[in-house]
């Protein structure tokens, strides 16, 4: 090999290495991404079973049913007629209650319309509404003035009196 061919081989090998690294990073991110949905979104476009998503909204009034052990079933609603039944096994945050803003993460069980959550997030203030949920309610025209009690913070911790008081429960 002459000098020109060696240089071409090194450049081609380097580009191949970079392409492989980019593909591996893209694959890793695609496996860990959980898209955010509200019940109205799921009514329009169902999600394939065993696809990991985040489901946000309000815990439906009168929907919390405690089962055997630490299993809890409740509905997540977005203020419209749409509601999604959620099943969670684990310890719920102390601040979890009906009418509270909640974000759950998990997937739909195959062959059912039940969302099986493995993470439940609830916020400290009864007037707090997660930013994603508040934005979606505004888009759908379901937002009521005074709901949420505050403007959605632009950055984590801004606009909250006690930003560290987020409750998280993970199985």
Swiss-Prot record:
Keyword Cell inner membrane: yes
InterPro entries: CcmE, CcmE-like_sf, NA-bd_OB-fold
Transmembrane parts of this sequence: 8-28
Signal peptide: none
Keywords tagged on the record: Cell inner membrane, Cell membrane, Cytochrome c-type biogenesis, Heme, Iron, Membrane, Metal-binding, Signal-anchor, Transmembrane, Transmembrane helix
Positions of region (Disordered): 132-171
Cell location: Cell inner membrane
Membrane topology: Single-pass type II membrane protein
GO terms of molecular function: heme binding; metal ion binding
Functional note: Heme chaperone required for the biogenesis of c-type cytochromes. Transiently binds heme delivered by CcmC and transfers the heme to apo-cytochromes in a process facilitated by CcmF and CcmH.
Name this polypeptide is given: Cytochrome c-type biogenesis protein CcmE
Gene: ccmE
């Amino acid at each position: 090999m002459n000098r020109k061919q060696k240089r071409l081989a090194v450049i081609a090998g380097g580009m191949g290495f970079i392409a492989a690294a980019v593909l591996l990073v893209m694959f890793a991110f695609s496996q860990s991404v959980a898209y955010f949905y509200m019940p109205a979104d799921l009514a329009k476009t169902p999600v394939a079973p065993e696809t990991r998503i985040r489901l946000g909204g309000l815990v439906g009034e009168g929907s919390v049913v405690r089962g055997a052990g630490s299993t809890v079933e409740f509905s997540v609603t977005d203020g419209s007629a749409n509601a999604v039944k959620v099943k969670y096994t684990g310890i719920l945050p102390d601040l979890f209650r009906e009418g509270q803003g909640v974000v759950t993460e998990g997937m739909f069980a195959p062959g059912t319309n039940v969302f099986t959550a493995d993470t439940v997030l609830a916020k400290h203030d009864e007037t707090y509404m997660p930013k994603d949920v508040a934005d979606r309610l505004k888009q759908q025209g379901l937002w009521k003035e005074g709901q949420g009690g505050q403007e959605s913070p632009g950055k984590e911790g801004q606009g909250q009196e006690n930003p560290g008081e987020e409750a998280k429960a993970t199985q």
